[in-house]
């Protein structure tokens, strides 16, 4: 157990262990990597800091890095995706964990800071928060860092902006650009998991509904494909004319969000951009329309405006 960890409850570890074991048995490639790592110890003496969605699959990544000799410091990249039982089990295994489900922004910043303060050699980022904090609060560490990788489209956009402004001072690999990431994880993984979440949350049938998908990148393609497979009538909104044409040729109805707002029953944003659905769209929507965001950050739907104009709020 890591004495430095900040977790919700260590007694949750057995539940986390069961989840990790199940996932591990379905990850043959990572198991093979771990076997090599245990023999070769390529990360011996190095510190690795991770900011990822802290759940069973990323826990297996943490275990693999540790098997390679790394001292691993892990936190969540989104407070709502952190699983407390996974954090507890990783802590039991000796990973330094700083993560609690539903933490405040202040706690989230503390957790990011906690994986940076040990001065990591390698970074595994999902959304760019580690790199951003190093740049703004720990600039002296930049020369020490060997490099790292960024998983998601949103984080890569932040990194490219930093690079353009001359603010990125160590190499970062854009994992999302790899074919094995966007062709499969984004399209099939995100496509399925979005509807897993929607179905568990709403308990609504998708068939026959008009589903509006904002964005036709790889995630948007996957979401649209799964919506169609579930029997929905799919409308795609896309600002890139080439991607919009691709959606049309794939058999989907394409229109602006202004028009789609009047028709949709279920709205799913997967753009990585800010304020995709705003007040002008809320006012056009049907009563009972369901809004969902599948982007990394909670910025695609203008929830501040929605809270302001809402007649009633329930949780």
Where are these regions (language model features)?
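Glycine/serine-rich phosphate-binding loop and adjoining beta1-alpha1 elements at the start
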Residues: 2-43, 74-209
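Gly/Ser/Thr-rich loops at beta-strand to alpha-helix junctions
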Residues: 50-58, 78-82, 128-130, 218-219
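Short, well-ordered coil/turn residues at beta-beta hairpins
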Residues: 51, 126, 268-271, 294
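Glycine-rich phosphate/diphosphate-binding loop of Rossmann-like nucleotide-binding domains
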Residues: 52-70, 185, 189-263, 269-274
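A short helix->loop->beta-strand "cap" motif at the edges of active sites that frequently abuts
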Residues: 69-70, 95, 141-144, 231-232, ...
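ADP-ribose/adenylate-binding Rossmann-like module
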Residues: 76, 122-126, 138-154, 283-315
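A short, aliphatic-rich alpha-helical micro-motif
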Residues: 116-117, 206, 260-264, 282-286
